[in-house]
């Protein structure tokens, strides 16, 4: 299986957004049942895409988008953030997410620390980040969320860090 990681281009943006929303929605609904609420609103994706230092990637296999990521690179501190990483719904658990992450690390060798978050209920993501990608859980975020946010199922989020190298 050959996965290519490329910069997301404008022509692929709607597919990227639709696929990431579906992936997040299905994971939430698998845990909590059907929801009328969109778990990952387009505005949240747009906010990440428009964050200073944001780089968005698509992962393709046979020229079909199978996943992607949005990272935010702080060129001064090299403490960088993984805002989103997804694998298209229906093809998870085949190693695609790990291939995406490995390529992101390769593309950003100057990174000192990576940081990301995932919902408390998402045990598959926790396993992925801790056991596959070698992140460490550094904080449990159980704060009151902004009005309308349900993406953590009301259970909070874990914050992860991965120290790549020391200053």
Regions found by a protein language model. Give the residues of each.
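Conserved GNAT-fold acetyl-CoA-binding loop/helix
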Residues: 24-46
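Conserved catalytic-core motifs of GNAT/GCN5-like acyltransferases
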Residues: 117-119, 126, 130-157
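Conserved GNAT acetyl-CoA-binding A-motif
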Residues: 108-120
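A short beta-loop-alpha structural element at the N-terminal edge
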Residues: 3-18
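A short helix-loop-beta-strand connector motif used in the catalytic cores of GNAT acetyltransferases and
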Residues: 43-58, 67
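Conserved acetyl-CoA binding element of GNAT-fold acetyltransferases
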Residues: 78-89, 117-118
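Conserved acetyl-CoA-binding loop-helix of GNAT-fold acetyltransferases
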Residues: 87, 93-106, 131
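Conserved beta-strand in the GNAT
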Residues: 58, 64-73, 81, 86
